[in-house]
């Protein structure tokens, strides 16, 4: 019998595992793994949340989007309602995803660009791909990476950056920084969705002039079919697919497919921005049609990969994940991410594994650093989880809902900003602007002054009774709640050796367990 494993998490991503033939000697077969993670895909932007069997388990209205493939996928899967992106920003989340470490240890505390040498994925730690490679896997990466400090290493223009923008954001990742990926079709970050580019394994640039998720899905299908003998068919494979949309821009048909836009183009904005905390009068509101069109396009691209897996008999295990959400006119902010609001932090996570994982909903508050060890655990590689990993392996809970596993009490929130600059204007440190904690009931975020390190702003929401986070509660009137959240936050900050713990920031509020 085939065993299929599929996981969908935040922003949106796909991780797939499938079984291989058992080697001689009767040893357990190694599963194939595919992990797809679209950028800036929020948990609320999935149609099935409004359908029977799902809507009863969440206290929010889903966005009015069309995601038919994800709808079907979710009904065969374990779906998390409360997966969290702890530092809801592209590079920091990806650093945590790859290393299983929080941003202060992964090497990626800030979004990567050429002005931030302080932010680049560490070369001296084993990433999830290093572990899979060491276990005998062929490893392939497709699409957006955005974890490297850009340097002037353009393969086609030696001594120059791969883009002329200042600071440079896009980056070429040389072979020695690919962490076990032996097949490469990737770029750093570039936001022209119908004019993407990629560097292949040998550093050759490709400019396909095609909407990037559909192009990447096609390349994944080609890899699955082993066109050109790009992988060893006797080996299991680990694939990561970093789709950029529905990440901004979302302003015109240059950013999405017209057939998807047509589903939304005639809808009044107040019928699209239906969350009570959304403001359809904001200038950004027109973006909703294009954002939702990109969501539908990503769903279609995901479907192409699923169809190929089924066609080839490789649909046995699959997981889906993302990096952060999108506020989209909620909370009266133009910033789509990097905030403790549920639209930004709460991401999709879905797992399908017939015969192994029971289709169900679960409120496990999975954090970004937990993904790497959990994926390794699901692939039977728990014994190979690196000692550097700070996240927790929750694979036993996926495989058995009654497993004796200590669940997290909540998820840490992290916001870092640029710190000190050197004489050349390069960022040499980062400012830990905010830390917070989200439990099943409340969200707390504390913001400090850059110089004094004193509290300057707080957010406290009763998420159970105020799911759209419209009523910021005063700290002094909710002391018992704040004390409890700060106690939980202090434990995690100490455990991960966060700058707030090292500097004892707000120690009058946060007990660090001295």
What are these regions (language model features)?
Residues 2-13, 20-447, 453-456, 467-487, ...:
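Formylglycine-dependent sulfatase
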């Amino acid at each position: 019998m085939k065993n299929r494993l599929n996981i969908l998490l935040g922003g949106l991503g796909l991780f797939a595992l499938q079984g291989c033939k058992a080697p001689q000697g009767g040893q357990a077969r190694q599963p194939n793994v595919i992990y797809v993670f679209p950028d800036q895909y929020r948990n609320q932007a999935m149609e099935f949340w409004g359908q029977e069997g799902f809507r009863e388990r969440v206290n929010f209205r889903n966005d009015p989007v069309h995601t038919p493939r994800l709808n079907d996928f979710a009904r065969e899967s374990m779906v998390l309602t409360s997966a969290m992106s702890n530092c809801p920003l592209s590079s920091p989340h990806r650093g945590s995803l790859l290393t299983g470490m929080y941003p202060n240890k992964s090497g990626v505390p800030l979004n990567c660009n050429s002005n931030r040498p302080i932010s680049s994925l560490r070369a001296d730690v084993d990433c999830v791909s290093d572990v899979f490679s060491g276990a005998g896997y062929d490893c392939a990466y497709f699409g957006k990476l955005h974890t490297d400090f850009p340097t002037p290493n353009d393969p086609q223009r030696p001594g120059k950056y791969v883009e002329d923008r200042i600071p440079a954001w896009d980056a070429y990742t040389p072979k020695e920084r690919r962490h076990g990926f032996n097949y490469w079709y990737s770029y750093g970050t570039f936001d022209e969705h119908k004019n993407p580019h990629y560097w292949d394994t040998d550093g050759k640039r490709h400019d396909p002039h095609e909407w990037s998720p559909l192009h990447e899905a096609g390349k994944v299908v080609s890899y699955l079919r082993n066109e050109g003998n790009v992988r060893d068919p006797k080996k299991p494979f680990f694939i990561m697919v970093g789709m950029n949309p529905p990440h901004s821009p979302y302003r015109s048909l240059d950013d999405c497919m017209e057939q998807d836009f047509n589903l939304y183009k005639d809808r009044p904005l107040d019928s699209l921005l239906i969350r009570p905390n959304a403001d359809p009068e904001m200038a950004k509101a027109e973006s909703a049609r294009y954002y939702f069109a990109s969501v539908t396009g990503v769903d279609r691209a995901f479907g192409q990969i699923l169809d190929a897996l089924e066609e080839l008999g490789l649909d046995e295990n699959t997981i889906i994940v993302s990096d952060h959400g999108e506020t989209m006119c909620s909370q009266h902010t133009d910033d789509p991410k990097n905030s403790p609001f549920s639209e930004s932090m709460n991401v999709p996570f879905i797992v399908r594994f017939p015969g192994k994982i029971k289709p169900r909903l679960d409120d496990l508050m999975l954090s970004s650093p937990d993904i790497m060890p959990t994926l390794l655990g699901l692939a039977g590689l728990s014994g190979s989880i690196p000692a550097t990993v700070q996240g927790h392996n929750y694979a036993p809970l996926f495989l058995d809902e009654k497993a004796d596993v200590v669940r997290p009490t909540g998820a840490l929130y992290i916001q870092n900003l640029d710190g000190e600059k050197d004489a050349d204007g390069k960022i040499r440190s980062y400012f830990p602007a905010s830390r917070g904690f989200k439990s099943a009931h409340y969200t707390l975020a504390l913001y400090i002054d850059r110089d004094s390190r004193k509290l300057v702003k707080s957010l406290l929401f009763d998420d159970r009774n105020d799911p759209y986070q419209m009523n910021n509660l005063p700290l002094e009137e909710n002391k018992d709640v704040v004390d409890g959240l700060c106690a939980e936050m202090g434990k995690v900050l100490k455990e991960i050796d966060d700058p707030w713990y090292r500097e004892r920031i707000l120690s009058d509020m946060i007990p660090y367990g001295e």
